[in-house]
Amino acid sequence: MVKAMEQEQETYKSRLFHFKNMNENSASRHVKSWSSDCAMRMDGSDNLDDDDNDMMMFRSQPGKCGSVDRPSLPIGGVTPNRNDKLPRVSSSDSMEALIILQAAMEQMKEKFSKLLLGEDMSGGGKGVSSALALSNAITNLAASAFGEQRRLEPMAVDRKTRWRREIGWLISVADYIVEFAPTQQTNKDGTSMEVMSTRQRTDLLCNIPALKKLDAMLLDCLDKFKDQDEFYYVKKDSPDSCETRNDEKWWLPAVKVPPNGLSEISRRFLQSQKECVNQVLKAAMAINAQVLSEMEIPESYLESLPKNGRASLGDVIYRMITVEMFDADQFLIEMDLSSEHKILDLKNRIEASIVIWKRKMVQKDTKSPWGSTVSIEKREQFEERAETILLLLKQGFPGISQSSLDISKIQFNRDVGLAILESYSRVLESLAHTVMSRIEDVLYADQLTQEPTNNAPSKNRYSLKENEKLREERLSFTEDMASGTLSDVMQWGNKNNEMKKESFFGDREKPLLSKVTGIMTNNKKSSYLDNLGAMRSPTARYS
């Protein structure tokens, strides 16, 4: 009896082993079918309805479980567990990922719907152009992502993730801006022929990858300050902040460094990061300037210009630009650059005069019956001088507000590709300027520990050697003026000469070009990106 029971047990074990092998093969086939169906569902549709779920389950399990003949096991037998081999379709992780994906898709739909409506939620067609709506979207995204970057530290994970995700959505429009280009096509018989095919527009093909690289470099620079422990920040109302308080940036937290200053390794690291960010800033400025130069000047801006460059610049500035002995650096020393309003006003005047002179060189001033009093060669010379001054202003004040000409170009631009390049490069330029400013704050706090005697009078973060060098240049320029020939003096004119001497020698303490970065924030309570974020469309700051 016992021997018969043992034989029966061995028979059941052999049948169970055979059934288990069949189950494993079936499970592997089910997993492959389920994976392919899930991939098709994720790529082909947004929502999973009940009918779709039923269809997916039907396709993933072509055979019914009840169709398998299960052997009857005796009492005490072991039932095979099929759940050990089959994956769980509705796990908590997959459901959470699906919810996040659906939320991101809804957010993307909302964003692109606003872009298509042109910021006009009523749908009445009174919104802005697609180019301006896209430019505003990139500007507002950067303001929300980088507006709170008040410390030299990595970005928050959620803000960095949102920035990378949404900027990818917005600049993905550039992938569909194409142009025709000739390509060689080889036929089956071996002959080749030239056909026209589409490719991404050349300016986008070159600049979009470059801007992405600059973006990654800036974020990587911030990530490198994650584990630093040599400097920290204190709140602006803390008693410890009075020692290193910079009145020009009173709303920012104060930087604290060790009593003996930073180590040599940290100081070199900060200098290297500053140089890297400076290169990013220059590259972003170059791309932005190139894109703005390619935009057409609106007719409304041309109609608002005065008749000649002298009326735009004013008599004083016009005489300073049109003299024989012209020096752009000396011109900026002579000008009053004590506030952002004055800097922006000078920038607007210079740009307006450049546009006027360029138009007159093209039109050759045929309206005047007596001809122009200024030759074309002189106009070209004046235009080059004005462009040099404008370039120095942009380099000396990278965080300055946009000029009237730039705002007009952005408002009336209809090229979506140029709008993407301009806004993307502009926000990267602002971010690079912010990061460089935060690095300079740390270096300034370290400099105070090395030179405590210069704590009170030093409101700028530039060394005295640079100021002395500029003073020596000023004195050498004065000596050159004094040793000029009689013809040079006659060209200046007696009245103008007296005016220049009074303005040049009367105020020795006017801000130099090396001191310009501090005056931009005298009366500002928010950053440049914060101001841009609240703007529906680019508008002039000063009326």
Swiss-Prot record:
Found, by tissue, as follows: Highly expressed in elongating regions of roots and pollen grains. Expressed in flowers, and at lower levels in leaves and stems.
Is-annotated flag, keyword Cell division? no
Q: Per the database record, which ranges form the PRONE domain?
A: 95-456
Keyword ATP-binding in record:
no
Give the CC-aspect GO terms: cytoplasm; nucleus
Could you tell me the superkingdom of the organism this chain comes from? Eukaryota
Q: What Pfam families does its record include?
A: PRONE (PF03759)
Write out the annotated subcellular location.
Cytoplasm
Q: Which GO terms fall under molecular function for this chain's record?
A: guanyl-nucleotide exchange factor activity
GO terms of biological process kind:
root development; root hair cell development
Keywords on record: Cytoplasm, Guanine-nucleotide releasing factor
Please name the InterPro entries in this protein's record.
PRONE_dom (IPR005512), RopGEF (IPR038937)
Annotated region (Disordered) at: 61-89
Principal cellular location given in the protein's record: cytoplasm
Q: What else is known?
A: Plants overexpressing ROPGEF11 show retarded root elongation and irregular root hair formation.
Quaternary assembly: Interacts with ARAC4/ROP2, ARAC3/ROP, ARAC9/ROP8, PHYA and PHYB.
| Domain description | The PRONE (plant-specific Rop nucleotide exchanger) domain is responsible for the GEF activity.
Please describe what this protein does.
Answer: Guanine-nucleotide exchange factor (GEF) that acts as an activator of Rop (Rho of plants) GTPases by promoting the exchange of GDP for GTP. Functions as a light-signaling switch that functions in root growth and development through the activation of Rop in a phytochrome-dependent manner. May act as a negative regulator of phytochrome-mediated primary root development.
The protein's name:
Rop guanine nucleotide exchange factor 11
From what organism does this protein derive?
A: Arabidopsis thaliana (Mouse-ear cress)
